[in-house]
Each structure stands twice: as structure tokens, then as C-alpha cells.
């Protein structure tokens, strides 16, 4: 397995790629994002925010787990970092990105996603 990437190293790459994917999605011009009218009634946007940040937390904790770092030791600092990142993205949408508008409710959905991802990671990666 020396010539190919190990699961542990791939897990880090996946977490970083997801991080970049979320950044790109959040920086995309708002008028170029498809609008599905029927989804507006269930706040689909908030579910997406929650899911993106839950996935980011799970991927990051998986990387820690596969690289033999104790998940419980790092879960709170990583959660704090991701919550800060979610708030920063909303601020950047308000100030830097074209046709994007940051919303505090999106920041809340991001944060709840981190909490959900933390719960899932604890269930998956701790004994």
C-alpha cells in the first residue's frame, strides 16, 4: 500500500475537498443558484446548510479517527472552528460575494449542522 494513498490520508483529502466544496457553493453568485419554488415552503436552503456542516464535521472527525487521534479530545475545538467558519461564510456572503446575502438563520443552521455532525461522529468514531 506504499504506492497508493492510505485510508487515513484519503480521509484528510476528503475533509479538505468538502471544505473547498462548501466554500465554492457559498461563494457562488446568488442569481446563478437554481431556484426550486416547491422547496421554498420547507426551507430547503436551511436543510442544505445543516447537511453541509454536519458532513464537514463527520469527515473531519473521520480523518482524526483514521489517523489515530482521539475524537473526543478534538471534537469541541473542531466544532468551535466550524461554527466560526460558518459565521465567517455568512459574513463573507454579505460583504464580499456577488449577489449573495448572509443570514443569521443560515449561520444558525450551519451551527446546528456542526452539532448534528458532532453527535454522529461520536456515535461512529468513539467506543
PLM ranges: what are they?
Residues 1-105, 111-127:
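Bulky hydrophobic segments
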Amino acid at each position: 500500500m506504499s504506492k497508493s494513498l492510505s485510508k487515513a490520508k484519503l480521509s484528510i483529502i476528503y475533509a479538505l475537498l468538502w471544505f473547498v466544496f462548501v466554500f465554492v457553493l457559498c461563494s457562488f453568485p446568488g442569481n446563478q443558484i437554481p431556484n426550486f419554488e416547491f422547496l421554498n415552503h420547507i426551507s430547503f436552503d436551511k436543510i442544505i446548510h445543516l447537511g453541509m456542516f454536519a458532513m464537514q464535521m463527520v469527515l473531519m472527525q473521520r480523518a482524526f479517527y483514521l489517523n489515530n487521534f482521539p475524537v473526543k479530545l478534538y471534537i469541541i475545538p473542531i466544532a468551535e472552528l466550524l461554527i466560526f467558519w460558518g459565521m465567517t461564510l455568512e459574513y463573507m456572503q454579505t460583504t464580499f460575494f456577488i449577489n449573495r446575502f448572509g443570514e443569521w438563520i443560515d449561520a444558525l443552521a450551519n451551527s446546528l449542522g456542526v452539532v448534528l455532525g458532532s453527535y454522529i461522529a461520536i456515535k461512529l468514531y468513539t467506543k
